[in-house]
UniProtKB/Swiss-Prot annotation:
Regions crossing the membrane: none
GO terms under cellular component: cytosol
Organism of derivation: Hydrogenovibrio crunogenus (strain DSM 25203 / XCL-2) (Thiomicrospira crunogena)
GO biological process assignments: response to hydroperoxide
Protein name per Swiss-Prot or TrEMBL: UPF0246 protein Tcr_1650
Lineage of producing organism: Bacteria, Pseudomonadati, Pseudomonadota, Gammaproteobacteria, Thiotrichales
Database matches in InterPro entries: YaaA
Stored PANTHER family: PEROXIDE STRESS RESISTANCE PROTEIN YAAA, PEROXIDE STRESS RESPONSE PROTEIN YAAA
Amino acid sequence: MLFLVSPAKALDETPAPEQIEKTSLAFGDQAKQLMDELKQLGPVDVAQLMHLSDKLADLNFERFQAWQYPFDDTHSKQAVLLFKGDVYQGLEASSLAAKELSYLQTHLRILSGLYGLLKPLDGILPYRLEMGTKFQNAKGKDLYAFWGEQITELLNQQLAEQGSRTLINLASNEYFKAVKKQKLNADIITPQFKDWKNGQYKMISFYAKRARGLMARYAAVNQVEQVEDLKYFDYDGYQFAPDLSSEKDWVFTRKQAD
C-alpha cells in the first residue's frame, strides 16, 4: 500500500534534527536536467511563468541559481520536514516516533514538479515549481510532458516490491495528473473529507488538505497494513460515511470543523 500526497509551497527551512536519516533521490538526474533549463530564466521570466510577485520571483530565481546536484548535505533537508503547507500540518511528521517515520518512508510518496516522486526522508533543496506549471522544456510543453511515464513506472516498481496493488490517492488533481492511471498496476482509492455546512456535507479546501495529512499520520501511528483499516480513521472528528462512499471513493465526514 502506498499513499500519495502533493508537496507544499510553504517551506520550513530550519535545520532538521541530526538523528533523522536522509535518503537519496530516485530522480536526481532528471531534476538536474530540468533545473539546468530553469536556470536559463531571469527573474521576470520566473514571475511570468509562475505568476509570482517580484519578491517571490527574485527568491525563486535565486533558489534556481543556487541549486546544485549532487547536493551539499548540509543544505538539503528531508522532504517531509521541509514542506509545511496544510497537508503537512496535519501530518506533523516532526512529532512522529522513529517507527512511525519508518512506516512513512515505506508507505508514503510525495509527488513533485521538480523531483518527480519523493520518499519522505529524501534530502532536497528548497524550491517552488508546481506540477501544473506550463514550462516548455526539452521533452515537451509542460511538466507532465517532462515526467511522462517515469513516475508511474517507479510507483509500479515500488508497489511490486511491497507485494501490494493498492494506492491511496491523497494528492490534488493537479499532481495526480502526473500519474498515468491506465498504466498503474494498482487499485486506486481516493479518500474525500467533507464538513457539514449550510445543511449539507461539502469539501472545504483547507480542512480537506489538512485531513489528507491526518490520514497519513493515522496510518503511521497505527502501522496500518490492511487498506480496510483506514475506514476506522477518526482524527479531528472525521468518520467514514458508507452511505456517501463508493468502492473507490471513500468519504469521511464530520459535523463541526475544529
